[in-house]
Amino acid sequence: MISKIIKALDNFERNIRNSFGKDISTKSGRFWANVHFQLMDHAFIRIFWNNFHEISEGVYRANQPSPSHLKSYKKLGIKSVLSLRGRANQSYDLFEDEYCKRLGLNLIYTPISSGSAPMPEDLLKIIKVLRELPKPVVLHCKSGADRAGLVSALYLL
């Protein structure tokens, strides 16, 4: 019984998450995409909590950057952004792509799953990409903890 309720709530949340936030081309679309970014992607928490840390000279890890974070990265001289989340037609990706282009930041996507162990070949590819990207570089996932932490540790090996 409880598992059915949990599954129903998960489906309800997923349906809400996927019902809006996919358009930033109009004033109204940008408004709703920002609502989506703040509430569904939990960006409002990242206003107060920024998981930005240097892991090696010229290599940083962070949580999902907001447009203001990307502006700060540009001021720090960061040249590249490596997203471990992958491409999605969702608010967080639309805003990140738009602002990286606007700021002249090199945005690369090398996704790894947040819900299962990554394949070794995917990790090797990410480390190769990370080593080849113009530095300074910041890598991120949603929270800057699990995926970003794993890739950071592997990079240091």
Language-model features, listed with the residues they occupy:
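Ser/Thr-glycine-rich phosphate-binding loops at phosphate-binding pockets of nucleotides
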Residues: 148
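Cys-dependent protein tyrosine phosphatase-like superfamily
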Residues: 1-137, 151-157
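Short cysteine clusters
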Residues: 141
